[in-house]
Amino acid sequence: MLGSERAVVEEWLSEFKALPDTQITSYAATLHRKKALVPALYKVIQDSNNELLEPVCHQLFELYRSSEVRLKRFTLQFLPELIWVYLRLTVSRDRQSNGCIEALLLGIYNLEIADKDGNNKVLSFTIPSLSKPSIYHEPSTIGSMALTEGALCQHDLIRVVYSDLHPQRETFTAQNRFEVLSFLMLCYNSAIVYMPASSYQSLCRMGSRVCVSGFPRQHEKQWKELCGRIVLDPEFMVQLLTGVYYAMYNGQWDLGQEVLDDIIYRAQLELFSQPLLVANAMKNSLPFDAPDSSQEGQKVLKVEVTPTVPRISRTAITTASIRRHRWRREGAEGLNGGEESLNMNDADEGFSSGASLSSQPHGTKPPSSSQRGSLRKVATGRSAKDKETALAIKSNESPRDSVVGKQFVQQQADLSIDSVELTPMKKHLSLPAGQVVPKTNSLSLIRTASASSSKSFDYVNGGQASTSIGVGTEGVTNLAATNANRYSTISLQEDRLGHAGEGKELLSPGAPLTKQSRSPSFNMQLISQV
């Protein structure tokens, strides 16, 4: 220790002793201006054989027991260095040199656990909300809470837990040593935002040394001070990590990362679960680069939450979400399928859905289940709409109108029956050699890949159906419906749709057939067999 540093410490000791009580506040406001005092006090504390160590410890205790908060914080900044010297001397069994530091630590502990009246303090801790990020979780991974009455009641609810009562201690023992030291570190962390940079450096050095002393990793360090293995407590290491985490983001990035690795190293050797959990969470949440420390006196902890695994989708994949996705897809395909079905009906009217399916070529792929479902939905919607229209007409019409309506429907059905014709796909029908046109009764229609009607049926008005087929030179085939009338199911439905509403134009027998008024027809290729 240099003579100048010794002189600074002696001046500080004598100055406070002669200070009256009325000037304590002004003295506390100017104490931080003495730049040479703090480094000199660190050197006195580190040297256990220095004769100024005992008066310095006594002076620090007097500052801490004063009513001025800034004087308490001045003493707290040396707490990490005092703990390191105490543990080092405890391992070396130098009880004589350790007495004054032990008394100072016990004095601070006993002052903090009791209030002004001498009653034990009950410390309260507020549980943080999970909606805010931390080193353990991201709020995005938590599902949104339902807006219920119970959730609204707990919106402003603050959860507070209380600590147990801490008994007073007169001496250090192996059983209560880390109970006292952990509580002292808790007091230090509660005021860490007011500590200078020198205190953060002392905290990081203390954490690294107590973790690797006596282990092979000690030889990798720059400091060569020999020390035995120091017994540690998991709770003390967690409090140490709390202070180190703040120091890392406030100017001690390199030292903080070094002590973090040393704490993980010691926790793995000791199999301490709590320090491992906190230290690994801290390490996985660190940014790649050091935080911006350009602003002096910032004193703000910047928490950069970086997940260890790639981010997953915020919406959980559940059975309900898959079902909703399938419904949306089927709805979109249903709209497309509805447009395609309308186009198909315009080009090839008179076909039923079953007929169009059965008339596809063998090389084409049948429609999917979703398309069949969409066509089924369109047909169901049409039938439901037809029923509603028919009920509305039936409720509005009088008995006389109902009779006229029945006659109109019967007349229109006869018209549609008479207007059905079959036009061949080819203009020429070729018959095999040596065969003649068979009789009408023995003629059979073979369904081919071009078009067919599997949903058609025969409607016979009395007697046996007789069909006459004529094959001309131009290949035009007409089906004369005399006693038998052949028409498809879709033809009946479209006739019903076309004439169910009011104000529709009646199809007169002599009027020419247009695209809107003609009866639906379909193409069919005829192949005769014997």
Curated annotation (Swiss-Prot):
A Pfam family this chain is assigned to: Hyccin
Keyword tags: Cell membrane, Cytoplasm, Membrane, Phosphoprotein
InterPro entries: Hyccin
Residue ranges with Polar residues bias: 353-373, 514-530
Subcellular location per the Swiss-Prot or TrEMBL entry: Cytoplasm, Cytosol; Cell membrane
Modification Phosphoserine, positions: 321, 341, 430, 442, 444, 491
Subunit record text: Component of a phosphatidylinositol 4-kinase (PI4K) complex, composed of PI4KA, EFR3 (EFR3A or EFR3B), TTC7 (TTC7A or TTC7B) and HYCC (HYCC1 or HYCC2).
Function: Component of a complex required to localize phosphatidylinositol 4-kinase (PI4K) to the plasma membrane.
Entry similarity comment: Belongs to the Hyccin family.
Name of the protein: Hyccin 2
Lineage, highest ranks first: Eukaryota, Metazoa, Chordata, Craniata, Vertebrata
